[in-house]
Amino acid sequence: DTLNPFAVGRFGTGRVDAYAAVASSMTTWASVLSASFKDESDDGLFTPGERARISLTVRNDLAPLTNATVRVRNVPAPFAAIIEQQGGTIGAMGQGETREARDVIVVSLPDEVPFNASLDLLVEIIDNGRIVGRELISTNVNTTYRTLDRNDLAMTANSSGNLGFNDYPDNAQGDGVTYRGSRNLLFEGALMIGTAPGKLVNVARGADTDQKDTAFSTTGVIALRTDSVPSGIRAVTSYSDALDPYRVGVDVRQHLYQTADDSLRNVVLSCYDVRNTSDTTLSNVHVALFFDWDIGPNGQQNVVSWDAQHGIGRVRNVARPEFPVVGAAMISPVVTHFFAVDNDGFTTLNPGIYDNFLRGEKWLMMSSGIARTQSAATDASMVIGGGPFALAPGETRQVCFALGAGDTDSLVSKGIAAARNRARTLGLNTQTFEPAPRTSRIVHIEGGPTLTPGSTTITFSIHFITGVIIDVVDLFGRTVSELYTARDDAPGLHVATVNIPTVSGGNYFIRLRTATTTDVAPIAIVR
């Protein structure tokens, strides 16, 4: 029983009298079809020290029972419930009869219970002194996740930066994201914060895609509150990267807002107050959300796209238009970044996430501007965020996102526009969206800004077919070395392998020139 608590009461001993089992016309067996737990605070959260009443639905499967009763006991586990009322009488039951046994069991939790623990209890059905049925019933207790369900867009959030579910990839803890009672729309939602590929903390899947990165440690368990949100609720939680080996040096206080007002019934706001806990200024800070959407029965035929007019990343099932459209927008006054992901991608600039999801890939997606604007029709994800910005020691910066769903693109756009306005009313860090022209730019210099002579890679984006020249220039704008030339590069992201010249150590610029634009990035060459 200790090694297999899920099978307590199911393993027998001794010999099986097979003939008697099939020959008897009075074989008895009953089943527990369902069990419901009602905690005394009636908030759906079974917490340490709290009492709960358990109701059972019992079915008699075989021969009639004359005076059935139920009783419960603990099974081997890290903690034991305090059983205050062990069971009660159900009575006579005919073959095939189903009966409700309300509040038949009362248990309470001890004062010390692990987070997100499973309370497992063995229910035994007894008739005339003989056990005629056994069933293990379970519920999650002392949970660190909550579901906001006051409007049409219901969403679970946890206490360490995930949206949708707490326990990727099992996804048994939480309700995901649903619209008007739909099936779940989100497989994975995760916060990512970084200043460089090697300084990136997150709770998305990682090098092993069956496990998520666990950069954030809970410092305040998520709580639901009704203050500050007219006709709605908000959730508050906090967490820190202090224990992560890739730590940036931040803690986060997250606020989620949900209201039932007509114009906001299809949206949720999620804001992140990011504070620098280190003793040095953090530069190049980026904050992003990763979403692996599953719109439809199997998550296929999803297309993620960028709506440049409204500043919204959208996803829809192109084969099943009856399913909702979902949108996400970064609504704070920092530069927006967006990347549409083919989950089965395999190229440098469309790396995919089936084989792994490395920090370098996460950084590419969260810091490359409006980079990949549409996915294929496949199992698709998106990364949307904002940056760069700097944080002095102890300084806090808020980055907010609006998530919306609807039957049409128009409903999503209207909901997110209303969310921007409500965010402003609530005093959150937001701004009105103004479509910005896309510009060609240097996205990333491998190893930069301090470089040594030799090979490195430069990632750059261009927004129309154009010739491209990348060179090294000195402080007076004089060309020191030409690194890359192309006559007709296509729009999108490009990665060029270049050789940094052997020159006197000092400060220089890498310059990108197209037919209409110029961009520069400062570097230091050391020898």
Describe the residue ranges of each PLM region.
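C-terminal subdomain of the subtilisin-like protease fold in secreted/lumenal serine endopeptidases
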Residues: 1-50
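Surface-exposed, proline-anchored Ser/Thr-rich loop/turn motifs
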Residues: 46-47, 431-463, 473-478, 505, ...
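Intrinsically disordered, low-complexity Pro/Gly/Ser/Thr-rich segments with frequent PxxP/GP/PP motifs
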Residues: 80-113, 385-395
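Terminal connector regions
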Residues: 102, 106-148, 405-427
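Beta-strand-rich N-terminal accessory domains
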Residues: 138-225, 261-263, 284-285, 299, ...
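Extended, loop-rich substrate-binding clefts of extracytoplasmic carbohydrate-active enzymes
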Residues: 197-270, 378-380
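Glycine-rich (often Gly-Gly/Gly-Pro-rich) flexible segments and glycine-rich loop motifs
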Residues: 281-379
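C-terminal tail/sorting-segment detector
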Residues: 482, 496-497, 501-527
